């Protein structure tokens, strides 16, 4: 498909911002579509051994002078006798009353994966998979459109995601999976073993970037005899997304075609009784039927096509 070809307009919430790898600090970027309830931002990196402090600001605009309003500042401090985290809001040129959280859940020299989950009334923060703090908004979330990172921090990747629609309303905390750049394990075609098959509740996560001139993208689930009970196939020539059965029958998925050249994507497959539920870029797109015995006999996930992979989890 030509890069000049017209793309159908789709809602901002369907489009995911590509991850940023190894940004130079200080680093600032616009958040595509701004923040809204259900948006997640992940931050992977390392705390330098000499670190005194760093801050992650979710801002209303990006001007340098005057300083923009900051809806939420997350600032770990390592230089005191008792390391802690400061959270605060900056409005109209003034910082408001800060909230101090004892402990940091991080130490100098530690690698980390911090996940910011934005909900209707508050933001929740987890560090390395453990819930750490929550902070009620003092400014409207809809005003936030900029991320700024500064201080003593080495950042490996910044990710922008929508919450998993399969756990909406659940008390479970979202799981943050790291983004990897140029990992040999993610070369396409990519294969992952499923030694125990798939069971209800299991989620397959595939994240990547569509290449410049793509033809197709397929995600296949094979059993121990190399039989392929089901395949998810995106065709860029006719702009269709479909489930393909083992005998070649197609079941088109009627939804906006979200795979576009040089755009980031996230595929989620949830195993449930009687089949698989699909979500793309955080949007549920229905299910396909597969009996439990067939699900348990699956032994391999195989990904092929014109994509660059950043994360595969199953």
UniProtKB/Swiss-Prot annotation:
Contains two homologous but distinct carbohydrate-binding domains. Pfam families: Gal-bind_lectin (PF00337). InterPro entries: ConA-like_dom_sf, Galectin-like, Galectin_CRD. Residues 27-161, 190-314 form the Galectin domain. It comes from Mus musculus (Mouse). GO terms for biological process: intrinsic apoptotic signaling pathway. This is Galectin-12. It is found in: Nucleus.
């Amino acid at each position: 498909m030509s890069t000049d070809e017209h793309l159908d307009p789709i809602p901002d919430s369907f489009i995911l911002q590509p991850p940023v790898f190894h940004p130079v600090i200080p680093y600032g970027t616009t958040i595509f579509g701004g923040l809204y309830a259900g948006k997640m931002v992940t931050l992977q990196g390392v705390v330098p051994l000499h670190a005194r402090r760093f801050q992650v600001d979710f801002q209303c605009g990006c001007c340098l002078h005057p300083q923009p309003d900051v809806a939420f500042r997350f600032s770990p401090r390592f230089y005191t006798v008792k390391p802690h985290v400061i959270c605060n809001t900056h409005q109209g040129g003034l910082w408001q009353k800060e909230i101090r959280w004892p402990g940091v859940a991080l130490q100098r020299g530690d690698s980390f994966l911090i996940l910011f989950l934005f909900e209707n009334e508050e933001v929740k923060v987890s560090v390395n998979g453990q819930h750490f703090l929550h902070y009620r908004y003092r400014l409207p979330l809809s005003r936030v459109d900029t991320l700024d990172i500064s201080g003593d921090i080495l950042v490996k990747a910044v990710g922008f995601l929508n919450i998993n629609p399969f756990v909406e309303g659940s008390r479970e905390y979202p799981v943050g999976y790291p983004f990897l750049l140029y990992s040999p394990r993610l070369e396409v075609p990519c294969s992952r073993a499923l030694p125990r098959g798939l069971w209800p509740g299991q989620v397959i996560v595939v994240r990547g970037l569509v290449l410049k001139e793509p033809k197709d993208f397929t995600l296949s689930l094979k059993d121990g005899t190399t039989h392929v009970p089901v395949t998810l196939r995106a065709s860029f020539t006719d702009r269709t997304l479909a489930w393909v059965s083992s005998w070649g029958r197609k079941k088109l998925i009627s939804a906006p075609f979200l795979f576009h050249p040089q755009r980031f994507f996230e595929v989620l497959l949830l195993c449930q009784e009687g089949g698989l539920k699909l979500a793309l870029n955080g949007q549920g797109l229905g299910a396909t039927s597969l009996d439990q015995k067939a699900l348990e006999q699956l032994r391999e996930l195989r990904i092929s096509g014109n994509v660059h992979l950043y994360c595969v989890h199953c």
